[in-house]
């Protein structure tokens, strides 16, 4: 699939690049996408939730009052779960939420996501561009020129660039990532995929396509 390369003003540069069929034209595997997104979302849990049981709360070392004669219910300890300040019954404990997925399936999921984007004409390739200085206005301007100022957009860069990142971090509908670090969730959670020309090569290498 050949696509035209646009400049930051939204005009055609006269160049075209090939979106390789092995990445952008496969039959998407929905189950692989499901497994990868489930793994990504699950692994975001810290799993540090914890409450104290009756053996961990403070106090309650002795019987709070005598067994008979007070008119109250029998109490052996103020740590009892039915008492205010007592321990919790079956409360949450630290838990590892990690859901594993093998590299082959993760790669298939990313390629499936990219193929969906290509199929729906949601990929734009632009020339390599970085603002001359940290300036949000410049990034807003080129997004507007490309017709992306109102669309949730993922911009893929060939490598980490602080000037571009800091210029775009205040734009609510724009995410900026290095091409080799974009996950299946990142690709599908944005309406448009804006790829810089050099980033396309980085993306292909990260997927094992030279």
From Swiss-Prot:
Give the Gene Ontology MF terms in alphabetical order. Answer: rRNA binding; structural constituent of ribosome
Q: Where is this region: Disordered?
A: 44-79
InterPro entries per record: Ribosomal_uL4, Ribosomal_uL4-like, Ribosomal_uL4_dom_sf
A family per Pfam: Ribosomal_L4
- The answer to keyword Ribosomal protein applying to this record is yes
What GO biological process terms are annotated to this protein in UniProt? translation
Q: Which UniProt keywords apply?
A: Ribonucleoprotein, Ribosomal protein, RNA-binding, rRNA-binding
The record's Gene3D superfamilies line, in alphabetical order, gives: 3.40.1370.10
Q: Does the UniProt entry include the keyword DNA damage?
A: no
Where is it found, in Gene Ontology cellular component terms? ribonucleoprotein complex; ribosome
Query: Which family does the entry's similarity section mention?
Result: Belongs to the universal ribosomal protein uL4 family.
Subunit structure, interactors included = Part of the 50S ribosomal subunit.
Q: What functional role does this protein have?
A: One of the primary rRNA binding proteins, this protein initially binds near the 5'-end of the 23S rRNA. It is important during the early stages of 50S assembly. It makes multiple contacts with different domains of the 23S rRNA in the assembled 50S subunit and ribosome. Forms part of the polypeptide exit tunnel.
The name on file for this protein is: Large ribosomal subunit protein uL4
What is the phylogenetic placement of the source species in the record? Bacteria, Pseudomonadati, Chlorobiota, Chlorobiia, Chlorobiales
């Amino acid at each position: 699939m050949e696509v035209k390369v646009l400049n930051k003003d939204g005009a055609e540069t006269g160049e075209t690049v090939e979106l390789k069929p092995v990445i952008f034209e496969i039959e998407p595997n929905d189950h692989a996408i499901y497994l990868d997104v489930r793994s990504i979302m699950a692994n975001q849990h810290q799993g540090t939730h914890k409450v104290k049981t009756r053996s961990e709360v403070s106090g309650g070392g002795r019987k709070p009052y005598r067994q008979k004669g007070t008119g109250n219910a029998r109490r052996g300890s103020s740590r009892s779960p039915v008492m205010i300040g007592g321990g919790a019954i079956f409360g949450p404990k630290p838990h590892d939420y990690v859901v594993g997925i093998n590299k082959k399936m993760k790669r298939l999921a990313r390629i499936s996501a990219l193929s969906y984007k290509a199929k729906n004409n949601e990929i734009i390739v632009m020339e390599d561009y970085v603002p001359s200085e940290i300036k949000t206005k410049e990034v807003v301007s080129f997004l507007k020129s490309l017709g992306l100022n109102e669309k949730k957009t993922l911009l893929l860069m060939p490598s980490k660039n602080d000037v571009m990142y800091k210029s775009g971090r205040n734009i609510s509908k724009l995410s900026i990532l290095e091409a080799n670090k974009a996950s299946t969730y990142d690709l599908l959670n944005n309406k448009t995929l804006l790829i810089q020309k050099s980033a396309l090569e980085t993306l292909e290498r990260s997927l094992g396509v030279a």
